[in-house]
């Protein structure tokens, strides 16, 4: 297929999956990757893609384009997309992956210092500010889903342990990022 174009003949894979799951007594949880706007392997983006419409709202990080989590308009945009999914489809749950900032990549810094300076809300540490943005997003996502269909489950795929002994005395005995 081509991004931004409906398949011909038209069919809706999410609707089809919901029907097939429900016929079999199974739940269907839609799974999205909210901040990742373009992966390394993506070559062409539709003209109406958020990256083309609002290039200042994304940053390049290690070859990927990421919707900047520090911008309130990006949190709202993602919540609007989720609201559309929840309203239009009979999903049983919505699951998000990579709901946080990009994983560390050697030699790359997350280019959000300008947004931190502008929107820090008095938070003195950029990493605390990033966690604050994630918390704002989680709350907005939960409220968005529950306002439309309170019974729809909301799930998150967190990444391991947030701290380990190699970077914090109070961390876990793990060796993850």
State where each predicted segment sits:
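Active-site neighborhood of glycoside hydrolase catalytic domains
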Residues: 73-177
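Aromatic-lined substrate-binding rim segments of carbohydrate-active enzymes
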Residues: 1-33, 121-148
């Amino acid at each position: 297929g081509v991004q931004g174009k409906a398949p011909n003949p038209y069919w809706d894979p999410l609707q089809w999956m919901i029907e097939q799951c429900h016929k079999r007594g199974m739940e269907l949880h839609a799974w999205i990757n909210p901040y990742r706007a373009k992966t390394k392997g993506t070559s062409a983006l539709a003209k109406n893609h958020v990256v083309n419409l609002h290039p200042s709202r994304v940053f390049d990080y290690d070859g990927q384009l990421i919707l900047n989590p520090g911008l309130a308009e990006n949190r709202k945009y993602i919540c609007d997309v989720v609201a559309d999914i929840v309203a239009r489809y009979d999903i049983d749950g919505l699951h998000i992956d990579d709901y946080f900032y990009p994983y560390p990549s050697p030699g790359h810094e997350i280019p959000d210092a300008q947004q931190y300076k502008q929107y820090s809300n008095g938070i003195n540490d950029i990493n605390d500010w990033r966690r604050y943005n994630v918390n704002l997003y989680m709350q907005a996502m939960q409220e968005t889903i529950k306002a439309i269909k309170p019974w729809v489950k909301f799930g998150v795929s967190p990444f391991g342990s947030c701290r380990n002994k190699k970077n914090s005395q109070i961390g876990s005995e793990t060796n993850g990022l």
